[in-house]
Each structure stands twice: as C-alpha cells, then as structure tokens.
Amino acid sequence: MFGRGPSRKSDNTKFYEILGVPKTAAPEDLKKAYKKAAIKNHPDKGGDPEKFKELAQAYEVLSDPEKREIYDQYGEDALKEGMGGGGGGHDPFDIFSSFFGSGGHPFGSHSRGRRQRRGEDVVHPLKVSLEDVYLGTTKKLSLSRKALCSKCNGKGSKSGASMKCGGCQGSGMKISIRQFGPGMMQQVQHACNDCKGTGETINDRDRCPQCKGEKVVSEKKVLEVNVEKGMQHNQKITFSGQADEAPDTVTGDIVFVIQQKEHPKFKRKGEDLFVEHTISLTEALCGFQFVLTHLDKRQLLIKSKPGEVVKPDSYKAISDEGMPIYQRPFMKGKLYIHFTVEFPESLSPDQTKAIEAVLPKPTKAAISDMEIDDCEETTLHDVNIEDEMKRKAQAQREAYDDDEEDHPGGAQRVQCAQQ
C-alpha cells in the first residue's frame, strides 16, 4: 500500500523497553531477552496474556532487520500504516514455540504448546434423485487429495531435519520496500520466495525421493456416501478429517451437499409430496378412479367416494404416503393430489337439456324480457390472460421507446422552459 512517512517521528523506543534491551542490542541479545521474559509471562505459567502478546509483537519487529530499520527510523506508526497492526500479525504462541522445537513448550505435557492451524474443508455437490432420498441409497465416489508422504512422514527430507529459512527468519513472510520520493514509500508483505511461505528449507541432497521435498503426495480415495431416507435438499454429509493433509495442520473435512434433482411427476415440499392429476367433468361429477405409481414402484388405487363431487383446483390428501421423515423413516408425510377438471369445449342443445334435467336449478331468478330489452348485448371470446398481459406490457414498452426517440432530452427542455 502507499503511505506518506509521518511528519514527526513517532515512538521508536517502546519495543526495546518491552524487551528490556537498549536500542543497540544485537540479535542474540534480543533472543535471550525475549525467551526469558516470554517464559516468565507465558499464560500457562500464570503470566499476563497481554504482556505475553506485547513481548511477541516487539520481538517479531526487532528480530526482522527490515522491520527494525523502519521502526528505528519512523516508529510504530509507520509499521501500522504499511503492515497492519505494527507487525503483530503472527500468533504469539507460534513465535514462542519456535524457540522449543516442534513441541513448542518447555512446561511439560500439560502446556498449551504450538497450536496447529486447521486445513480447509473441501465441498462437493452430490446430485440425487427424488427416488434416492425416498428409498435411501449408497454412492461410491472416487476423489483425489493430498496426503502426507508415507516415506518421510511429512518431513520432506530423508533425515527428517529442516532448517529455518534465512530469507524470512522462519516467519514465512517477507516485506519489500520501495521509496518514491521524500517521505513516500511502498511496503508490501508477501510469502517468502525462498521457502514458499513455509518458514523452513530442506537441503537438496536430503530431499525425500518420494515427495521431492513437498511433504505431501497425491492419492486416490474412495468414499461411500450414505444418503439416508428423507434427507433434504442442501443437507450436508460430512467426512471428518478426510480433506487434504498438510504438515502441522489439522486436516479439514470433505463435505457433500445434497442437490435433489427435479422429478417429472412428484414435487417435494419438506416431508410432503404433491402430484398433479386431470379428470374429466364427467369424472368430477360422477366419480373417478385411477392408478398412481409411487416412487418405490408401488401401485396406489386412487378413487373418489360415492356421490362425491370434485371441484376444479381442489386438493385431496393421502396420509403416510409422503416423504419419509429424516432419521424417523417409518414416519411419513402426506401425499397431496391437485385436481384439474377438464371441461368440454361445447355442448349440443340435447346435451344441455339433459344436463339441466339432472342438475340443480339456478338459484337466481330468470331475467325478464323487459330487462333484456334495456341491456346492450355483448360477445364473449376466449382469451389466455397471461399472454394478453404480456402483449399489453410489450406494447407499452415499445410506445415509451418511440416517445423517447421522437423527443430526446424532453425532461431537460421542460426544465429550461420553467426557468
């Protein structure tokens, strides 16, 4: 980022005071002072956590030659502008643990020690059919992942040894500084090129022949994914600790996310199923029966009750024929049938009379001839209301576009006229 150097020098003695060393202290003096004070103030020994954090922050800055030079010249404010937080970006426990090897603690097995970072989870979509989540199924999936090298146990070297990177002092990060003029500089923090951000290097002759010093190798892994009855869309199935492995890292999880595909016949809403069925007007008035093939291939006989009339756009429900309830597979939701009644296009006069003879008479009184004479006669025609509304909306848009072309800048002309 770009920043202007402070107009006045800010505090450049605080970090030395925290460590209890003079500004002329050599790197070895800094190490000794930090180690002694950090052990004394370590939280696992009842020390002050804030003091422990301050010690780590001070040592991180002063042990890095480039950061120390900036601090001595401009003070802590310059570090905050260019590096964010005055160089306190590393975990104080990680800095402390670098003095005591991979165990990271001098206080025995009960000490907190070096905290491992957690690897990223790997998420995969898992497409399933409605039949899959109705009946339950198992899917075998082959995946590629990174695994710790078995030959060197993830060390990267034949001897198991590594060296602290001299380019970044083991931090894994470096800072590049560019000066553009008096008081103008650019400070960029980036992964160390020498160690690729690991903070350590391996001698070429000592590199593991299997992983070539990378510490991990690619491997194929087959997972059996158990899709249980009643699982929902977007529900997750987790395989803990099966993602990519890395040294000093808690392995992340592989997560499969259920993606339920659309079904041509059934629609699912939670634990219920919906199906559309069309019947004729005769069936709606006189009764119906039909066979419905369910998701498990069972044949269900669906029929109306004697004398029952089915109204258009009505619903009927069948209990315990919906989706199995997750982890309670012997309990199911409902199956809803949405009825559409198909009316005839027209009727002959004889059919009309026959129907009038059996259907209930109209409840409203007939219109008299005198009332008819006072009315204007109209003609009804068929219409698809959705298509009609779309056509009108399109016509309005075209009319608006034509008006804009005929009168460009119309609103501006009105404003000028008002002046």
Swiss-Prot record:
Bilayer disposition of the protein: Lipid-anchor
Main location: membrane
Compositional bias segments (type: Basic and acidic residues): 378-391
Quaternary structure and partners: Homodimer.
UniProt-recorded name of the protein: Chaperone protein dnaJ 2
Binding note for cofactor: Binds 2 Zn(2+) ions per monomer.
Gene3D superfamilies for the chain: DnaJ domain (1.10.287.110), Heat shock protein DnaJ, cysteine-rich domain (2.10.230.10), Urease metallochaperone UreE, N-terminal domain (2.60.260.20)
Ranges in a coiled coil: none
Residues recorded with modification Cysteine methyl ester: C416
Residue intervals of every CR-type zinc finger in the record: 136-220
Residue sites binding Zn(2+) 1 per the record: C149, C152, C208, C211
GO biological process: protein folding; response to heat
Pro-sequence residue ranges: 417-419
Keyword Ribosomal protein annotated: no
Repeat positions for CXXCXGXG motif: 149-156, 165-172, 192-199, 208-215
Residues with lipidation of kind S-farnesyl cysteine: C416
Organism ancestry: Eukaryota, Viridiplantae, Streptophyta, Embryophyta, Tracheophyta
